[in-house]
């Protein structure tokens, strides 16, 4: 299991938090995702054999946010 912090631009409210956390939770291999709005970050626990960082970034970007 890997823990990764991803920097995300454009999140500002609970709707943003829910959108990003839900998108990541749908990915096979993600065990948890927690958004920190103050830091513009999401902390993700995942199985690197089942999901890639690139797939997680795409899921976030598909919700309309920019991954830095």
From Swiss-Prot:
- A Pfam family cross-referenced in the UniProt record is HMA
Report the GO molecular function annotations.
copper ion binding
* Boundaries of every HMA domain copy: 2-68
In terms of superkingdom, the source organism counts as Bacteria
GO annotation terms (biological process): copper ion transport
Matching PROSITE patterns: HMA_1 (PS01047), HMA_2 (PS50846)
Swiss-Prot/TrEMBL keywords: Chaperone, Copper, Cytoplasm, Metal-binding
> InterPro entries, from UniProt?
CopZ (IPR049740), Cu-bd (IPR000428), Heavy-metal-associated_CS (IPR017969), HMA_Cu_ion-bd (IPR006122), HMA_dom (IPR006121), HMA_dom_sf (IPR036163)
Would the keyword NAD be found if you checked this record's keyword annotation? no
Question: What are the record's GO terms for cellular component?
Answer: cytoplasm
* Binding-site list for Cu cation: 13, 16
Report whether Repeat shows up as a keyword of the record.
no
Location in the cell: Cytoplasm
Task: Output the CDD domains linked to this UniProt entry.
Answer: HMA
The task this protein performs is described as:
Chaperone that serves for the intracellular sequestration and transport of Cu(+). Delivers Cu(+) to the copper-exporting P-type ATPase A (CopA).
Q: List the NCBIfam families hit by this protein, alphabetically.
A: chaper_CopZ_Bs, copper ion binding protein
User: Under which name does UniProt file this protein?
Assistant: Copper chaperone CopZ
What is the scientific name of the source organism? Staphylococcus haemolyticus (strain JCSC1435)
């Amino acid at each position: 299991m890997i823990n990764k912090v991803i920097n995300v631009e454009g999140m500002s409210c609970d709707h943003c938090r829910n959108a990003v956390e839900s998108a990541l939770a749908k990915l096979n291999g993600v065990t948890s995702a927690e958004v920190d709005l103050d830091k513009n970050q999401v902390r993700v626990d995942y199985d690197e054999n089942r999901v890639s960082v690139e797939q997680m970034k795409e899921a976030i970007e598909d919700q309309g946010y920019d991954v830095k």
